A protein has these predicted regions:
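M16 family metallopeptidases and their MPP-like homologs
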Residues: 1-11, 20-24, 36-89, 95-148, ...
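Conserved active-site loop region of the serine DD-peptidase/beta-lactamase
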Residues: 33
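Short, conserved charged micro-motifs
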Residues: 15, 72-76, 174-177
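Compositionally biased, proline/threonine/alanine/serine-rich low-complexity intrinsically disordered stretches
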Residues: 189-205
Length: 205
């Protein structure tokens, strides 16, 4: 099964953008992030799972994703939900996690500008998303200046599991009962072409 859980997030051109990138790095943006360590390294239910914040001028998508074993679909959804909720309050970003995220984001910068095309793309992002002209000049310093308190203040504003829409692609006969047991809300069925099926016809597929 392939699991997605997402909701809207602020535009890229917002004062918290660098903090958002850092928080996402801890939650699901890297191999050592919480979501991947949980589902891949601990549970062994997925080859790779995480979270993404897409870039956009307006409201954009924040989502968790997890391709998992069919027989662990329900359990994986539960773990994803736990991670989304935990970082908001019960399990805030630790000092070690913040330090690792800061290192990951800043040390990656030289590799992102190895070619003229890459440099041009970064300059294009400034124009495309309405970022400050000094966005990349000050990026590393702003990442390094973030504190655990910044992460704790941002997490409940960025990560909103109660507003998430869940999308699960898989063998319905094997996963539907478990998903229903989670009581996440109304279930809609979508065919391979993206069409929402009426309840009557969905029942036979």
């Amino acid at each position: 099964s392939v699991i997605f859980a997402g909701h809207l997030a602020p535009p890229k051109a917002n004062p918290d953008e660098i903090a958002i990138e850092t928080l996402n790095s801890v939650l699901g943006g890297t191999f050592t992030s919480r979501v991947n360590l949980n589902l891949r390294e601990d549970k062994h239910w997925s080859y790779g799972a995480g979270t993404i914040v897409w870039d956009a001028r307006g409201q954009r998508l924040f989502f968790a994703y997890a391709p998992v074993q069919t027989d662990k679909t329900k359990e994986s959804m539960t773990e994803v939900s736990k991670e989304l909720r935990a970082i908001r309050s019960d399990k805030p970003v630790t000092g070690d996690e913040l330090t690792q995220a800061q290192s990951t984001l800043t040390l990656a910068l030289p590799g992102e500008w190895e070619t003229m095309n890459a440099v041009a793309a970064s300059l294009g992002n400034i124009v495309r998303f309405g970022l400050p002209d000094t966005y990349y000049d000050t990026y590393a310093d702003r990442v390094k200046a973030l504190t655990g308190r910044d992460m704790s203040a941002l997490a409940p504003r960025l990560v909103q599991p109660d507003h998430a829409v869940w999308v699960v692609v898989g063998d319905r006969a094997k996963i539907e009962t478990g998903i229903r047991e989670l009581n996440l809300g109304e279930i809609r069925y979508i065919d391979a072409d993206g069409r929402v099926l009426p309840a009557a016809s969905a029942g036979s597929r």
